[in-house]
Amino acid sequence: MNLISKNKITFIFLFSIFLLPAYGANKDTKAIYELIERVTPGYSSQYRLEIIAPDNGVDVYEVDGNGKEIILRGNTPVALATAFNWYLKYTCQAHVSWFGNQLNLPEKLPQPRERERRVINGRYRVYMNYCTVSYTAAWWDWEHWQKELDFMAMNSVNMPLFTIGLDAVWYNTLLHFNFSDREARAFLAGPGHAAWQWMQNLQSYGGPLPKSVIDRHAALGKKIIARQLELGMQPIQQGFSGYVPRELKDKYPTANINQQRSWCGFKGAAQLDPTDSLFTRMGRVFLEEQARLFGAHGVYAADPFHESCLLYTSDAADD
């Protein structure tokens, strides 16, 4: 058996270290080196990325140069991505947008004219609402979502709404509460109308949703939220506010489930009273199923009365 000497092993080890990309030691800068390579393939090696402290608690970025490299600094991955976008716009006169990119870059990137330092307005830069996804992104694949996530980071977004894969969360939750596969799938609206289901206006429109679609959305959602976290974003997940299938009343006849009024020609949704013990049980399972698929990241959205109204008993209405 051929043996490698200790000196040769040391040489191979050191040589391997020098072959590692510059971003290998830091996950935050690594994420943005990879973003740069996705947006401008072949150019990431011309940048040096550095993490700096925030500016009095505010996100900050810098664009600089040293005669050889473009130096981007920021206190978060999103701040670094924002610096990259600023450099493209104002040094390279390049452009990245929803409607097309202008990325006619020279082989050797130009140095910034001077050091630029900017703070980012707003601690929480929220992006998207439920309608956005169904209006625009209902049929996006991972390739499209990658571009959108890079665009978010380059435009300082750090708190995007996360809804892709919610149909899988609901499907799994309902199986815990005596719904069959078909009943659970029949509750779910099609992708083009899912927004209004998550806003608790309707159910079932465009259903029953095929299990293959539910599984595909779950797989896509896992990729999306992993990338959001990699880019240092804080995803907004779905909370449980008591919106439930109308059919839940048939399965739990003693539960306090109220029927909402009709909405835009659709039969009204059902609302589980938060004081009912079933609310706590169902909410816990919903959040557990969501965490099992996508993790639990601390910020949740829930609106039980979107374009609807509180339900009152006749006694309360008289007060």
Question: What residues fall within each predicted segment?
Answer:
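Aromatic-lined carbohydrate-binding surfaces of glycoside hydrolases
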Residues: I52-P54, N66-V78, T82, T91-C92, ...
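Bacterial N-terminal signal peptides
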Residues: I12-L19
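Contiguous, structured surface segment used for ligand recognition
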Residues: A25-G122
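A short, hydrophobic C-terminal helix/tail in secreted or cell-surface proteins
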Residues: D315-D319
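Bacterial N-terminal signal peptides that target proteins for export
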Residues: N2-T10
